[in-house]
Amino acid sequence: RNGLSSFAPALKWQPIENVGNFSVQSAFHIPIIDKETDINGVFLDQTAFMFQNRFFYDYTLPSGKWQLFTELNTEYNFGEKDSFANNTFVLAPGIFMSYFPNDKSTILGFVQHSQRLGLNDKAFTQDFTAVGFGGKYQLTEVLNLEVLYSKFVRGTATGLGESFNIGLRALF
């Protein structure tokens, strides 16, 4: 599967001036697809709109080679179209441990959980836990290459499996 499924303008800021390792990112996801599945029934993405807030905190160990990174993701999903995600709230904590072998590379491992709560009796409720590992490499001052493997180890109202992701990230 590949393609564009949503457009998401985002804003990231540091809400507490003297706490540089805590930040918040807010985004508004606008779906640009009409159907959540392809002709073979494979899930592509939700067609719900989403307001998302992500809270980040990191701690670098004294050696400077290791970093503990935590994230709390919250999502409110809504819209007029039929979507499994409409009228749901997601609470998703994650913890990542990164190792920096040099100034351009990162190797990481993680555990994440996602809890989707239906906000009415027609809404979809779901949860899952994933573990995984990956890496990042800084190609230029602006462009990073990222790879990630995730194994979904448990869940309710979801299929278990794994995912392989590769991406380019531009940081301006």
Please provide the spans of the model-predicted regions:
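Outer-membrane pore/translocation modules
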Residues: 1-88
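Outer-membrane beta-barrel "beta-signal"
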Residues: 8, 137-138, 160-172
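Membrane-embedded beta-strands of outer-membrane beta-barrel proteins
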Residues: 9-11, 26, 53-55, 93-95, ...
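Residue-level signature of outer-membrane beta-barrel architecture
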Residues: 13-15, 57-61, 97-99, 137, ...
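Repeated loop/turn-to-beta-strand initiation elements of outer-membrane beta-barrel proteins
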Residues: 19-22, 63-68, 103-109, 139-147
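Transmembrane beta-barrel strands of outer-membrane/channel proteins
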Residues: 24-30, 70-76, 95, 109-113, ...
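Flexible, surface-exposed loop regions and adjacent strand-edge segments
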Residues: 40-45, 86-89, 125-128, 163-167
